[in-house]
Amino acid sequence: MKKPSKFKPIGGAVTALLDPLLAKRSHVDAALALSWPELCGERMAGRTQPLKVTWPRRSGPDDPFEPGVLVIACEGAAALDLQYGTSELIERINGFFGYSAIGRIRIEQKRVD
């Protein structure tokens, strides 16, 4: 007969701890996608698409918040325009959220659907 283990699986506990933290960051991705034409302008919105926000690693809960990097898909011809307007776009995005959510933009040249 098998003895019952004193150990419990940690998967459920880890998920319960991480879900609220991830939800705070994922709202940025969803809000960006929904408001993209307003943030970057109709002309640029047709040639670009926000892909994801990557967040810097934190070594502990006491580390200060650091803004993320917004990865944007951009068609080749529009990349120069986007790069030129990067600082203004970061200001608009951070103004939209009310805090410094984005610190940098990384452009990936690819087809936008």
Could you say what each language-model-derived stretch is?
Residues 1-113:
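Contiguous, often N-terminal, cationic amphipathic patches that form binding interfaces
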